[in-house]
Amino acid sequence: MTISSLFDDLRQKTSSILAKREPDISLAEHTYDCLIAIREYLQKNERLWRKEWNKEITLIPFEEAIKLLITSIYFHDIGKATREFQSTLTDKAKSSHPFYAASVLPLDLGKVKNIPLGLLAILNHHTSYYVKTEGSLYEKLDVTSPSFIEGYKEFFDFYPKLVQKIFGLNVLPISPTENSIEDIKRTLLQIKTKKTDNLKINSRNQIERIFYFISGGLVFADHVASEKEFNREGFTPYFKDTGIGGHLANSIKNFKEWRNFQIKSSQTDYSVFIEIPTGDGKTEASLLWTENNLKNKYTKVIYTLPTRVSSNKMYERLKKGVGTNETALIHSDAKFILEEEFPENGDEQKLALEYYLRKFFFLPLTIGTIDSFLVRFLHSGRWDVSRFNLQNSLIIVDEIHSYNPRLLGFLLKVLEKLTNSGNKFALMSASMPDIIKEKFQEHLTFQTIGGILQEKALFEKSPGFIGKRPESLIEALNEVIFEWEKGKNVLVVCNTIREAKSFYKQLKKWFGNNQSESLVLYHSEYTHLDRMLKEDEIYFRLGKMGWSKLRSEKIIVNSSLTEFKKIMHIKLHKKPFILIATQVVEVSLDIDFDVLFTERAPIDALIQRFGRVNRKKLRQRKAAFKIFEKLHTGKKGQWKYPYPKEILDLTWEIIKEGDFNIEDTQKWLNRVYSEGNTFANNWYQKEFEDGYNLYGKALDITKGIGKLSLSEEKLNEFVLRPVEKGLKKISVIPVQIFDAKELYSKGFKEHYLNSLEIYLYRTLANQLAFKKDRWIDIMMNKNYDYFYGVNWGDSEFSPI
């Protein structure tokens, strides 16, 4: 009997049992689709799984793990063969079908170290019934024993035959059991309180790996099958075309040929560290490395960046070459971008599935923030699904220099885990201190591409000359205007929002009514929508975006609602202007200005600011980089500032005036961040080590199979980018926007896009009045507009 005839026989005998409606899919059809999805996956990925499994896992042979995965997939929806579930297909009520499944399956299904991993995977495939560290859904679940439909036993009868036909594997028959709900809950309680506590660290690591192979693999097959059943045209979890290099060449203006380091990247089979100056082609090198390694049976690419803005830009670029159906974006705003890409998809269930597939790395190429990637290694959300999908993936970490020591320490541990699982990585930086790179080399094996020794010509390029000034930046106001009058695009970077706004206010007085034509203020305290518009405005003024690409949105100007394009005249295209910004320009925007005025900052931050001026290091555009020493850091004797004082002082002492090249900045960087300086300070070393140890800490709490579900206070221990004590980050909507845009009648998307995030100082809390809305607080007594952001008044005190 063929596969199709065997399946047809099962389908006919169980035709009355549905798995889902709209479209109607029978349980037999969905089960078959899931089995085919995992068969295709194993055909593409089994080799690498098996290779690393045999080196790392001793608790269960890989062949048995595959059988357990297939068994879990086969029976995961058997709970739908109940009258209780079938009734939900018409009344849209919620179902507990994973629990129903457990009532007819062995309670020791897939037992490893006395933990029934197969049973847990089935229970867990929709909701974390078991795997929570504090409290569990099953403890509160009010469910009665289900009534199974006649014919459900056919699935048990066909199980060995279908598995043998589809996979060529022989499995032992499974007979239906009769477990009460109390039996199931008792089993889960024993697992939680007894069976996981005495596991040694090696066993716990193995249990984690086995569990996400089974649980993650089950969810993978379930969702891939569901996506295809929804008839989404062109969906595939695999690349259709791995020829990224050709797409890249076509996307680069005036492309001639690849550089030596890019060619070397395209021929490298190892993990790499790509060390190349800003604007010289690191991104292209990493993608050429990716193309080469996709040929070696790797099936996914994860490209991480520091911010949502930089992630969005990279997403827009790469999806043009790879295709929307194969490219995903993940970060906190990604859902709203997805809604814009699928406006015709009004079905909430379908849209939720599209979002799920992107959020948990189902698509071949995923671009997103580093946080969205790393959080899955802290057992957050569907960590098991993410970890399964990350297997056999290539990981690109761009702008690695921009992360704090705590995040770097955790990233190092994650890369250790991934390389032990067979993954490869590409780290990229224009300004990574040698001491940090050496910390990574102690734990990881990778090949360095670029650097001063390999690409000396690139590092000998000079973008211009440095001027060190003892006064404050605000005292250079007339110089800024003078440079602008010469027809230059001027970049002014302040270390705090307060200073940026103050500088902008002073320039406004000089420009008067023409300020909107010549000045742009950009910081983090704008609404999400206005930040996107600000980015568009900057690109438009620099000539990197055309008029037709500007968004048609409404903004608040002088307390009134105005069309964005009304303030963006066509004549502003490529017209010289002054951008006053904070650190948001360091990694968020791909911009190129003619001259820089900046407050002094840590050397790595300065290098990033330098990279936003004369980006190509052209001799004919030799630029001035003016750095100002005097800072407003709070009351005398107190240090209220975004950067550590010792790093600021050391940077100021080390950097030299006059002409400089990229090699000089690397030398300064390594002197500031040296073993004797930065790592001699306990705070940096401690933060790095704390980050490195977070993975083991999460594993201890979750026992390798749990979800990190803790109180807010305990969760703070796992924050990768901690904020200063005494601050609370909250989302608010300025009342002017709420009223003018009539948001009280709008949905969550509009509320979110028109909200902004503020750091609420305790000293400021009493000045604010909030009105509770459905989703986000409304800020009542502070003015807001597109040009300035929030007007805090004379006592304004914001962080960065």
Residue ranges and their predicted role:
Residues 434-484:
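Interdomain hinge/linker at the junction between the two RecA-like core domains of SF2 helicases
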Residues 329-340, 497-498, 520-536, 582-586:
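Conserved helicase motor
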Residues 384-394, 400-455:
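Post-DEXD/H (motif II) to motif III coupling segment of the RecA-like Helicase ATP-binding lobe
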Residues 324-379:
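Inter-Walker segment of RecA-like/P-loop motor cores
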Residues 298-322, 329-334, 434-437, 497:
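Conserved Walker A/P-loop ATP-binding site and its immediately adjacent core
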